[in-house]
């Protein structure tokens, strides 16, 4: 990155894979960026469900799902890094009266823009008790980029970026999330090509 280039921060943005991105893990992916800084980036793929259900995941940690509204929900392939580790992206859950709007869960990252990502088992225990966040997306694994790596991929036209909309994550059918994310840019799939930006 040159001294004249201002650093960009894409936290709480979507990365939308361009058609030319052939990496199996990321092809036609929409990734929600939980964190982006000069040190790198971390995100969760929001449109690639696995075969594992939320009930199945809870059973693996000796819990039962206590929420009928989540029955049948899929766990998502969040990315190729630490695929045995769970991440829960959700609306904020705060403890009323706690200092600095402390999160209700032990290991939670508050994401500027209004969402939280929790990695501790207590959020799963809350789901077992019939409580927990109203809207959530559970993944196994995550996507990450080292220093300057994402910026290089952006310069190579591997991704489109747009400010995230939580409704795309939580309220849009999985098969429509790619097109809805493109729609945030005023685009449709036919309008983008693998060679975008190249003469």
Curated annotation (Swiss-Prot):
Gene3D superfamilies: VC0467-like. Pfam families: DUF179. InterPro entries: AlgH-like. It comes from the Bacteria. GO terms for cellular component: cytosol. NCBIfam families: PRK00228.1-1. Belongs to the UPF0301 (AlgH) family. This is UPF0301 protein Daci_1578. It comes from Delftia acidovorans (strain DSM 14801 / SPH-1).
